[in-house]
Amino acid sequence: MNNQPKTVRVRMAPSPTGSPHVGLVRTALFNWAFARHHHGTFVFRIEDTDRERSTQESYDAIIDLMRWLGLDWDEGPEVGGPHAPYFQSERGDIYRDALARLAESSYTYDCFCTNEEVDARRKASGSKVMGYDGFCRDLSTEQRAAFEAEGRRPVVRFRMPDGSITWHDLVRGDVTFETRFVPDYALCRANGDPLYTLVNPVDDAYMEITHVLRGEDLLSSTPRQIALYAALEELGIAKATPEFGHLPYVMGEGNKKLSKRDPEAHALAYRDQGFLPEGLLNYLALLGWAIAADRDVFSMEEMVAAFDIADVNPNPARFDMKKAEAINAAHMRLLSLDVMTERVLPFLKGAGVLSDPVNPADTQLLELAMPLVAERINKLTESVDMLGFLFVDEESFTRDEADAEKLLNDDGRAVVRRALDALERVGEWSTGAIQDALQAELVEAMGVKPRNAFGPVRVAVTGRRVSPPLFESMELLGRDRSLARLRSALG
């Protein structure tokens, strides 16, 4: 984009409630990429005004997620910055001052109405306009005194201006709202606690946010915020109103908006499932943006270089788990053997396949085995099943029940018996010698097709139908362990 200000400042402002959602990650990613592309500032603040729902556990999960993904922030928790504090729960004096200044200039008014009274008036009038009806906008001194005598405590509402509000949305183009359909809205609770409707724009103003990139679900709140920004500018609190861009919905199964209840929505679960952070980010970037029409796989450096918010597609994007796994698999193929080995180690240790620390013999065996599986695993967790058979002792070795039932039947055991006889005669225990012996005995002598010949042997030795290459695996496993497993498969 050619007309960007010299200093771009964007923010991510999650609420620490519940498990972080992939929609949060997509929004954070687009803000991060936008800031990095324009050599700007990525601000991270915590919207914890909902004291009942905000938890330390959720905050820790958000920090953990951002660190794992490599979405580094320039200002915010744990790094500080010129606009600290970055927790809304610690900025109460700032919000109270803003409220007082808004009230002094008559941008707000006290509202004593109950929800029941508002609903009753709407039903009585037959109005179809939802929200507050402005009843308390111009209370007389007597009316106010009467409400106070009843012990009512008011909320503070912002006076929406007459007319219409138009802005150029960075994703959707020009958007206009008639303010008669945007009711006066509350800025704080009756107990004085500020609401999101106040603290979000006030924080953006004080932190000098230039661009607000957020989900489409917040589109309808934008005219309210633009009106509030105009007031904050008049009061000298805001230097300017930020530009807005509303990102497309992420849809789940059945073409419904992906919700926190959907299993694929939980962002940290992808780490547990063995996704690479770069693979997950690449896929989430595709939910509304593309680096090129004929290209899906790219690095974050490439995304930063190419990212333009104007290229974001406003239409809803559908979350496709198969596509996500395919993108992750492509990134797995880009890893060097050393890096892939480093990435799978925590999963192998966590599953008990390897000790912590890894003993020297297992380290050497892993280095020999990784080239066999590097092109076969699509997620880091798959290394456990693919490599586990090499490291487990014979007393703990097990076979997949379904695979054993299918391939180690009477015909399969007959193949295993002949394989055992042939391999017991092998002198040098090497990949080539193992392959030659089994090929001669099972395929040529028995006349069994290779698939039917080697499948039972594979399950007998590795425990699974899917494994690294059989002959190489048997060489790594060694003569004694390979023959022992063939014997145990015969019962």
Swiss-Prot record:
Disulfide bonds: none
Gene Ontology biological process terms from the UniProt entry: glutamyl-tRNA aminoacylation
Family annotation (InterPro entries): aa-tRNA-synth_I_cd-bd, aa-tRNA-synth_I_codon-bd_sub2, aa_tRNA-synth_I_cd-bd_sf, Glu-tRNA-ligase_bac/mito, Glu-tRNA-synth_I_codon-bd_sub1, Glu/Gln-tRNA-synth, Glu/Gln-tRNA-synth_Ib_cat-dom, GluQ/Sye
Residue numbers binding ATP: 260
Keyword vocabulary terms for this entry: Aminoacyl-tRNA synthetase, ATP-binding, Cytoplasm, Ligase, Metal-binding, Nucleotide-binding, Protein biosynthesis, Zinc
Subcellular location as annotated: Cytoplasm
Extent of motif 'HIGH' region: 14-24
Cofactor: Zn(2+)
Keyword Repressor: no
Subunit structure: Monomer.
Protein function: Catalyzes the attachment of glutamate to tRNA(Glu) in a two-step reaction: glutamate is first activated by ATP to form Glu-AMP and then transferred to the acceptor end of tRNA(Glu).
Protein name, UniProt field: Glutamate--tRNA ligase
Organism expressing this protein natively: Nocardioides sp. (strain ATCC BAA-499 / JS614)
